[in-house]
Amino acid sequence: MKGAVGKMWFKIISKIIFKLKLNRLFLYMFYFVKKILSHSKELPALDEAKKTLDNFRKNPKSSCFRDCEASDRPAAYDLDIIVPCYNVEQYLKQCLDSLLLQTTQYKYRIICIDDGSTDNTGDILDRYSSENSNITVIHQSNKGLSGARNAGIDLIDSRYVMFVDSDDYIVSDAVGSMLKAAYENDAAIVQGGYVRVTEDGRIIKRVRQKEGMLSIRELTGFPCMKIIKSDYIKSIYFPLDYYYEDSVMSMIVFALIEKNNAKVYGVDKIIYYYRYNPKGIYQTAKISPKSIDTLYITDQLHKDRNLYGLSNSRHYYEFILYTIRLNYARTRTLPENINKAVFVMFSDFLNANFKDYLTEKTMLEKSFIEQNYILYISACNFEE
């Protein structure tokens, strides 16, 4: 009798678990616990950790600092739009047409950088340039996304700057509406909403932007879908040879704007169409040695902050903790010795630069204080 009742309850509970889809949660937790138990608690010494990571992926050690002298000469344009291009013949015409067909009285220029393309990208750019006086084209050997953007930064002669990726496109009144908001509010940055689309243009997601003044914390970390006062962009380069080079926006550009108490404004309008690339960096990084670049670029940009007179703060410290969690999401599939080396390096980084901020309020902080790798994994997986 007891056996029959037990079987009945087992069936009932199993049905509830299946109905609520808790079986997936239990399965995930089972594999997570199994993974935790398989980890060794031993950690490498700091020098050994550095050597392990250096053998896995050399640190580019590329600074973002750009020495830019102030000029009293009036800017030639209201806006420079910087478009890095590499093998994008399939999407380039849509991008350029969207930039040219702007309904605005503001004066703007399109700076296109052909970054060593091997398809017809260069020819398309030359044809558009010959037919449109406000398109400037640079042809260069392949230097990567950062190198292409930096070539555009060298040519800036405008009050504001906009970055557009060459497989994306903008709405017809993007330039006019954003510059109007920038001038009326004396804003250092104006950010709009965006739509994420598939490779063939189908809408995946719409992200609205509220109208009005924003805090720095409300900005997305991407250089796109916003316009920025050129003085801030002319003071930086995108670091070369890293993944996640956009980190310079949050760690340097936004920090400079916050330091100057400059205004940040949002327009309640879809401005930008961002094309999702299933073969892009964020999708392929998990299997690449460059996935550890979050560690490298965070360390380099932290050093660069001193060159800009940027100091530590509670907000910056919390951003670093967020970055550490993000790094684990990018490296979790790498070998254990790599993840342990990254943990040791981040631990040294925190203790060297944020000892006064470290507390035991969160699992993540506690893991670094106690040098507890298992706790670190748990925090990165479950702690918000």
Name each region found by the language model.
Residues 140-156:
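Glycine-rich, basic loop-to-helix element that forms the pyrophosphate-binding segment
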Residues 77-80, 98, 109, 248:
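Cell-envelope/extracellular polymer assembly enzymes that use nucleotide-activated donors
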Residues 212-294:
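Conserved nucleotide-sugar donor-binding catalytic segment
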Residues 173-204:
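Conserved donor NDP-sugar-binding/catalytic core segment of glycosyltransferases
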Residues 98, 114-123, 141, 165:
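A conserved acidic beta->alpha catalytic loop
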Residues 88-101:
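Short, well-formed alpha-helical segments that are part of the catalytic scaffolds
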Residues 161:
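Short aromatic/hydrophobic "clamp" motif used to bind/position activated sugar donors
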Residues 2-64, 117, 333-384:
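Membrane-interface aromatic/basic loop that binds lipid-linked glycans or pyrophosphate carriers
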